[in-house]
Amino acid sequence: MKTIGVVIGTTDEPVTEEYYSKHSNKLSHLEEYDIYSDYIPYDYAIYSEIKRVGEKNGFQVIPLFGDEFTLIDANKCDYIFSVFEGVYSFMVGGLKRYTQYMNILKKTKAKVYPSQKIQEFIIKKHQYMKYLDTKGYNITPTFFINLKKYNVKSIMKFIEKNKLNQIIVKPELGAFKTGFKKINNPTEKKIRDYLVKLKNDGYTNVLLQSFIEEFNKFGEIKTYWSGGKNLYAYRQQWLDGEGVFSQVEDKQLLRECKAIGKKLLDDISKDHEKLIQCRIDFACCMNNDKRCREFFINEIEICPTIGTEYYEAYGKAYTLLANNFIKEILS
């Protein structure tokens, strides 16, 4: 019997009571890992669904806990599916654990989904953003900063050239806005001081972009894909630091985003590898109150956080993801 290991261990995005009530028979086994009905993180729910579908197809399915699993643990598996991924490993153990995590996935004899190579490619945002630019996709003007060696004067030239009065700085390996900062009227001192802080916090690379005033007014359009097909899309805005979620009202814009998303997935499949799942986020800047002037790809996630609220299709992605993963390893 072949073994599938599912990398889990977050404490994020617990499933709703409604989801638990409907699927309690598939989730009750999680109590052996001290995960109870009052708080089941999304990745444990995904693990449960992969376990259900995998066992139906003759696989043994085991958890691999992202903050502690070793190469020995990984090598007990024939296949590994990452839900808890590199950014989480950095969050729990800094650069040391992130490096260990990536080395385990690189060295294991198991076949890893998504591969270590593509995980690293997406985590290192400067790599995939350069890829998007090369392929002709719209991205916002971005300055990439290596915290081991950078020139503040070059950064200021980029700011002056693009006439930026407000900028945002976001580190690679940052998640849930960790390390994200908006800087008004940027100066060499403000930038240098913040980059020093990020380096001291363990980050290695940073993206600097324009702060787009209209960004939050119309929000991001987040599109979730599995098996090359779009399952759902929703709009996210921010109010007092909290996410506000709603349906996308501009259907034409949504169709355009989906068309670009499908093309991007085809390109990634051709140039890198076929993805079991992916979330592609689009953002707009506006020139009026009715229609987006120009939209761009703001972010790609290949191990996205998936909830069970209405705007994320009530957790249907868990079943779709599990079926597509098992289908892929059986093919």
What label would you give each PLM region?
Residues M1-V7:
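Extreme N-terminal starter segment of soluble prokaryotic enzymes
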Residues G5, Y79-V83, I168, L207:
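Structural motif
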Residues D12-E13, S37-Y150:
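Conserved N-proximal alpha/beta basic substrate-recognition cap immediately N-terminal to
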Residues V15-P41:
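A solvent-exposed, charged loop/short amphipathic helix patch at secondary-structure junctions
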Residues P63-G66, L208-S210, H272-N288:
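A short glycine-rich, hydrophobically flanked beta-strand micro-motif that places a catalytic Asp/Glu
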Residues L132-D133, I159-T178, Y203-N216, Y234, ...:
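ATP-grasp fold ATP-binding core
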Residues T178, K182-D271, M286, F295-F296:
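Phosphate-binding site of ATP-dependent enzymes
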Residues H272-L275, C284-S331:
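C-terminal active-site "lid" helix and adjoining low-complexity regulatory extension at the edge
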